[in-house]
Amino acid sequence: MKSLNTLVILTSVISTSVFAGAYVENREAYNLASDQMEFMLRVGYNSDMGAGIMLTNTYTLQRDDELKHGYNEIEGWYPLFKPTDKLTIQPGGLINDKSIGSGGAVYLDVNYKFTPWFNLTVRNRYNHNNYSSTDLNGELDNNDSYEIGNYWNFIITDKFSYTFEPHYFYNVNDFNSSNGTKHHWEITNTFRYRINEHWLPYFELRWLDRNVGPYHREQNQIRIGAKYFF
């Protein structure tokens, strides 16, 4: 019974991939196609009711190149509607800033807890760039995209969890993705291990679709990170 109660508690928090309280997070990533590393530092706070906010800062580094600033971002979400103890509807949004300009996104999450050890979140998201880029016709336009994401959350034990996360992107205007088409996929496999009430390390394997130029190969990425909860 104690193990079942633990799984129920973990299911509720894994549904949004967070634990309640303030935390700091550090993550390092390596893209095998571009030979690029990314360093991320994040601070955030998650309330017991499921609302949260986080601030993110990243830097990138490529071989024979200097460390460059990636982006700054602030994101927040709120569980607006919960008609049953299994179903949650949660809007969210973010704004970001990088060297070429700013942008943002709005999204709507629908989470359903099927069992104490499995829940699914479906996310509909619109990504917008405030700056213009040159499209396929040689004209300036916003390279916006529509995104559909799924988070398949599995509670393996009271400490170990796994998330399968496929995302589909479609470019709204006349732009191609790095695979040479108007749409692409990004698939993430996340493995988490809860050491204690403070430490939550994780490991991610990602496929970011094929890059047709300049790398002409599959974009695979490895991420290693950890969260510390206060």
UniProtKB/Swiss-Prot annotation:
Q: Membrane topology type, per the record?
A: Multi-pass membrane protein
What Pfam families would the database entry show?
KdgM
What is the annotated role of this protein in its UniProt record? Outer membrane channel protein that allows an efficient diffusion of low-molecular-weight solutes such as small sugars and tetraglycine. However, the specific substrate recognized by the OmpL channel is unknown.
State the family named in the UniProt similarity comment for this chain: Belongs to the oligogalacturonate-specific porin KdgM (TC 1.B.35) family. OmpL subfamily.
Matches recorded under NCBIfam families: PRK09980.1 (NF007434)
- What keywords tag this UniProt record? Cell outer membrane, Ion transport, Membrane, Porin, Signal, Sugar transport, Transmembrane, Transmembrane beta strand, Transport
Its main localization is membrane
Q: Which GO terms describe its cellular component?
A: cell outer membrane; pore complex
Residues spanning the signal sequence: 1-20
At the top level, the lineage of the source is Bacteria
Protein name (Swiss-Prot/TrEMBL): Porin OmpL
Q: What are its GO biological-process terms?
A: monoatomic ion transport; oligosaccharide transport
Question: What Gene Ontology terms describe what this protein does at the molecular function level?
Answer: porin activity
Q: Which SUPFAM superfamilies match?
A: Porins (SSF56935)
* Cell compartments where the protein resides: Cell outer membrane
Origin organism is Salmonella typhimurium (strain LT2 / SGSC1412 / ATCC 700720)
The reply to whether Phosphoprotein figures as a keyword in the UniProt entry is no
